[in-house]
Amino acid sequence: MKLFKISLIKNYFIEGSSYGLFNFDLQDFSNCDRVAWGNLLRRTLLKDLEGLRFGNSSIFISRSFSKIPYYHRVNEYSDIEQVNPSLLQVFSNFRNLHIFSSKPFYRKTSYSMIKVLTSRSYFSKDILLPNNLYVVNPDVQLFEFLSKRYKLRIISEICKGSGKSFSPIKKVNYVVEGIPYASLLLEIYTDLRANALSSLLATLRLINPKFAA
């Protein structure tokens, strides 16, 4: 078995991202193996890490003066004057939010809801989420509701998956250097759902479960 050593050079937050710089001491590897190892790390970081995001959303409307509220569904192309911006843009705002789970999330799909009862602006902090789930940035304005005659409910899927749409990884760079080429420098940028160090550890566990020990 070939052995290598990993050193943490930098690990900090910058402009809404976590940044990490790591050095892999690969003296026992050939030059081709070092490049292959760098490609494997980059590919796994970008494609295989799991994350959560909002999926499809549904909006329901009811007249506020009804004694027993009856909500009927409207589609995303409906023009509701009381909602600004358009429903299409509202749903897009949901999909652009990042969700963090404080504990392992085992479900493939869960749901969130916003109850729109008064005329005001609604933010990501108004989303009702299952236990242990949080929106990373709670102050994103989703829409403005301009009516006192209606009530709305917006229900959104919370989906778990891997790949670019779900992964917390924003960018990965690496370079093989040294004389001879004995080191691999790896840069990782993540959003605020995970830091660079925890993302690298999760990647190593995916590549080889023995790293979990």
From Swiss-Prot:
Which EC number(s) does UniProt give?
Answer: 2.7.7.6
Q: Any idea where this protein resides?
A: Plastid, Chloroplast
Q: Broadest EC class?
A: transferase
Which InterPro entries does the record cross-reference, listed alphabetically?
DNA-dir_RNA_pol_RpoA/D/Rpb3 (IPR011263), RBP11-like (IPR036603), RNApol_insert_sf (IPR036643)
What's in the keyword line of the UniProt record?
A: Chloroplast, DNA-directed RNA polymerase, Nucleotidyltransferase, Plastid, Transcription, Transferase
Looking at the UniProt record for this protein, which Gene Ontology cellular component terms does it annotate, in alphabetical order?
A: chloroplast; DNA-directed RNA polymerase complex; mitochondrion
Presence of keyword Transferase: yes
Q: What does this protein do?
A: DNA-dependent RNA polymerase catalyzes the transcription of DNA into RNA using the four ribonucleoside triphosphates as substrates.
**Similarity comment: family membership:** Belongs to the RNA polymerase alpha chain family.
Q: What is this protein called?
A: DNA-directed RNA polymerase subunit alpha
From which source organism is this entry? Euglena stellata
